[in-house]
Amino acid sequence: MYRSTKGASKARRDQINAEIRNLKELLPLAEADKVRLSYLHIMSLACIYTRKGVFFAGGTPLAGPTGLLSAQELEDIVAALPGFLLVFTAEGKLLYLSESVSEHLGHSMVDLVAQGDSIYDIIDPADHLTVRQQLTMPSALDADRLFRCRFNTSKSLRRQSSGNKLVLIRGRFHAHPPGAYWAGNPVFTAFCAPLEPRPRPGPGPGPGPGPASLFLAMFQSRHAKDLALLDVSESVLIYLGFERSELLCKSWYGLLHPEDLAQASSQHYRLLAESGDIQAEMVVRLQAKHGGWTWIYCMLYSEGPEGPFTANNYPISDTEAWSLRQQLNSEDTQAAYVLGTPAVLPSFSENVFSQEQCSNPLFTPSLGTPRSASFPRAPELGVISTPEELPQPSKELDFSYLPFPARPEPSLQADLSKDLVCTPPYTPHQPGGCAFLFSLHEPFQTHLPPPSSSLQEQLTPSTVTFSEQLTPSSATFPDPLTSSLQGQLTESSARSFEDQLTPCTSSFPDQLLPSTATFPEPLGSPAHEQLTPPSTAFQAHLNSPSQTFPEQLSPNPTKTYFAQEGCSFLYEKLPPSPSSPGNGDCTLLALAQLRGPLSVDVPLVPEGLLTPEASPVKQSFFHYTEKEQNEIDRLIQQISQLAQGVDRPFSAEAGTGGLEPLGGLEPLNPNLSLSGAGPPVLSLDLKPWKCQELDFLVDPDNLFLEETPVEDIFMDLSTPDPNGEWGSGDPEAEVPGGTLSPCNNLSPEDHSFLEDLATYETAFETGVSTFPYEGFADELHQLQSQVQDSFHEDGSGGEPTF
């Protein structure tokens, strides 16, 4: 093995550098670009051109004549395109980048490629995931893919446009040439069109087709500030089927799908409210002449502070529409989170146009435009001569004010079949009407109550909502901008908020929730009036038509009041939002209240029981029937009575009516020397117990309780002497009468029955004692089987322990 020396290392480096310089000379670049290339850039460009040469050399030769256009003519066509061509593999490795990229991104092709040989090196990191998803999405090779991403631009271009450039990419995968490398890396060819349109050359009357239509399906249109069509390119005939003359001076909102009105109006408002170089993007559906709907990716931008809007409309497929809409929604949510502003739909709350300015024929919607009957009167037409007369939107728009639709007057009820001649957002702010005039199609008119229906027909107990209870038919809501809103909420306005605002928006922002609606300050509201429950307040307002809205329900526009009753069920159906009440007035996702204590059914007997009687197990655990339980209780009572009679001395004078215990005996002195032959009697406080007749044990003809039977049963027990001495006396001498007890005449079967009763165990005791538990000691509750025959002086019995 040869040891490396300083001279040998320098020689190898010189050889490598010489080979790199040879590669630089082989690159098809201008000499000015070659001079400023570093060794790393040279090797990167060499890899790109090598992949390009291998791919195009191994591809399928083109069929047909190839001599129609020369190479120079092809280069001129590519340079004239409103975009640049891009070829890269599925893993992102670049194969080709047209020279026209310098006009759109500010970088030359050499500068962009010098950053790396992958497309991810020249794309904004925030869009890497979008591009990767599009490249890995499974589909046919000939299926077009359309997506948008941001390309890195030069410093000078970023200073002009304050950011990277948004580019719309449409391309497809091609069949790969033979080879293991190309089998796993199909080639994607795309045309990239910047979404920042270039100024149109020449003072032409309308937008021309442009070279972009050769690679991208699109048509251009110009709109007034109300989005009425001023001009449109002829290519609209291909995509929508309308002639150019059929769309001039028509409302753009008349072509929109009803579900896309909210998105279009919010972007339209943003263009009007914000100043500067603002562009709006939206994915909407436009109605074609044959009646179908076509997905359009629309890019709107303003030509000047007072000039009209220009729109680039790109027809897209359903899959592309879904992908673009998801991308736009995620970007809007991200921007709202960064800026700290809620992503809600704005609304106009002031008069944008006067009644005289609405007479321009540009505001007339096309046939089939939705209509509305929520406004008291139709606007009068005026004239708009120049764009300079169009008023600017106010910078102080109040979004907390929630207007309520008023009842249509008879003058408008007769003309419900006519189209209203206003398009949002330049709609006259009618008193009591919604901010935008989104007219309804015929199917949506079913939400409107008939003008001739009465209040009893419209308000039934099943249809009365919380919003109706809080807004009686006679309530007045003075408008802070116009005073004509007072006294407008009539009988036909007893609809829910959803029915009133359905044509305006597809989703309700937090400000439009029924329980958080804000109302303007009334001019004269009664004071010291309490908020009653909705069920009683609504009936009270029905009975008093002249009553105005209470002060508690009509705060100033800057405050928000939450109803204390009836709103918890509304919030339980809605997800919590940042503006949801959390101060105790309303309950967010309240849990059901559990009544009574919780109990757990234990399947086994708990361990560690001291005694069976102290067991906390429920009685239902053993599943006794009522009859069995009664029998057990009766047997326990009889056994306890027999045990009481055995442990306690009886009176010498036994009456014929039953057993009478001695209740006046004095306890024995424990210090006495007890040496008698008979068993001692413990000094216990005797309590009077009542005994039950045991007639069921003997023949009914014999009176069992006439004598004292206990002394006859226990013949061997001695009775204490009154002097305190024990002796073995004869029971006949001590018992008056000296007659034997009838118990001596019992049959052997009766004696056996009595013995069984004395040793009987209940089912509960048997079940518990059968299974000993851990920590369970029989000595804790078992009685002594033998009576002590002697006691010590200290009163203790038995043998000494030590």
Curated annotation (Swiss-Prot):
Residues 5-38, 624-648 form a coiled coil. Residues 1-13 are annotated as: Basic motif. The keyword Cell inner membrane does not apply. It is found in: Nucleus. Disruption phenotype: Mice appear anxious and hyperactive, are prone to seizures and have a shortened lifespan compared with their wild-type littermates. Mice show learning and memory deficits: while having intact memories 5 minutes after training, memory is significantly reduced one hour or 24 hours following training, suggesting that both short-term memory and long-term memory are impaired. Residues 470-495, 502-518, 532-554 have a biased composition (Polar residues). Ubiquitinated, leading to degradation by the proteosome. Residues 280-319 form the PAC domain. One of its GO terms (biological process) is social behavior. The keyword Repeat applies. One of its GO terms (molecular function) is DNA-binding transcription activator activity, RNA polymerase II-specific. Induction: Induced upon calcium influx. Expression is regulated by neuronal activity (at protein level). Induced in CA3 region of the hippocampus after contextual learning. Induced following sensory input in newborn olfactory bulb interneurons. Induced in the medial prefrontal cortex cells of the brain following experiences with positive valence. Induced in pancreatic beta cells in response to calcium influx. Down-regulated by REST. Transcripts are regulated by a subset of miRNAs, such as miR-203, miR-224 and miR-744, that bind to its 3'-UTR region and down-regulate its expression. It comes from the Eukaryota. Pfam families: bHLH_NPAS4, PAS_3. Mainly expressed in brain. Expressed in the limbic system and olfactory bulb. Specifically expressed in CA1 and CA3 region of the hippocampus after contextual learning (at protein level). Also expressed in pancreatic beta cells. Residues 470-554 are annotated as: Disordered. Efficient DNA binding requires dimerization with another bHLH protein. Heterodimer; forms a heterodimer with ARNT, ARNT2 or BMAL1. This is Neuronal PAS domain-containing protein 4. The gene is Npas4.
